[in-house]
Swiss-Prot record:
InterPro entries: ApbE-like_sf (IPR003374), MA1715-like (IPR037456), UPF0280 (IPR007183)
The name this protein goes by in its record: UPF0280 protein Mlab_0453
SUPFAM superfamilies per record: ApbE-like
Organism: Methanocorpusculum labreanum (strain ATCC 43576 / DSM 4855 / Z)
Protein family (similarity comment): Belongs to the UPF0280 family.
Length: 236
């Protein structure tokens, strides 16, 4: 298996693939998606700055329309979905090249399809459980988004307290947006109430860590003991 770091402007990723041609396809897909977003932002700067949902016209690039739709479902700004959207474009390009396996980690937002079982580590910063467990992901023919937001790890803006909130969806942009939105508001006390808002969404599972508290909702994959290497985490 090939593991290659790839950075383009502020996009910093790790690509996993079986063939170098699939890696190149992923790079091309991500560059095209990011370029589409950048060009659109020149025409609508508010799309980049808003912390609230923003619509996009039908003739906007597909990446922009995905981000806009995700912002409305999760009630966040559209840029909350940019990382997974770019990752999705790269993974989709790998599929189109004929790959049976592809994974892109864009700063903790993972998009994949796979013909094999995978382990995705759970990193939650200072939380006691951090780095000790992994999600056991069964083979996935459909693209899957596993997106994590944190108030204690990384440079992203968060208004919450969670060490990590991970959302699972076959719409990666919406997994990314929901992870951000939930991380902004989740506490151990309101978890069950907040999950009722997720029930009708595109997200089918949520795993949240706040200190020594862990919240689980939905159809989570099996969680197994693991040693998560910090060096394998994609970061700027």
């Amino acid at each position: 298996m090939i593991r290659e770091k790839f950075a383009y402007r502020e996009t910093i990723t790790t690509i996993l693939a079986d063939d170098t041609s699939h890696v190149e396809a992923a790079k091309g897909g991500m560059i095209a998606a990011r370029t589409g977003v950048e060009e659109y932002l020149l025409t609508d700067p508010f799309f980049q700055m808003s912390y609230s949902p923003v619509s996009a016209p039908a003739d906007a690039p597909e990446s922009v329309r995905c981000m806009a739709a995700a912002s409305f479902e999760a009630d966040v700004g559209p840029m909350a979905a940019v990382a997974a959207t770019i990752g999705w474009a790269g993974v989709k390009a790998m599929q189109n090249r004929g790959a049976a396996f592809g994974l892109i980690d864009n700063g903790g937002d993972i998009v994949l399809f796979s013909n094999r079982e995978l382990r995705v580590g759970i990193y939650a910063g200072p939380a006691p459980s951090s780095g000790k467990f992994a999600f056991l992901i069964t083979p996935q023919t459909e693209i899957l988004g596993i997106c994590t937001s944190s108030a204690t790890v990384g440079p992203s803006v968060s208004f919450g307290i969670a060490d990590s909130v991970t959302c699972f969806s076959h719409d990666p942009a919406k997994a990314d947006a929901w992870a951000t939105g939930l991380c902004n508001i989740l506490t151990p006390e309101n978890f069950d109430k907040v999950m009722k808002k997720v029930e009708e969404s595109s997200v089918f599972a949520v795993y949240a860590v706040i200190g020594d508290w862990i919240g689980r909702w939905g159809d989570l994959p099996e969680i197994v003991p693991a040693h998560v290497s910090y060096d394998l985490i994609t970061k700027g």
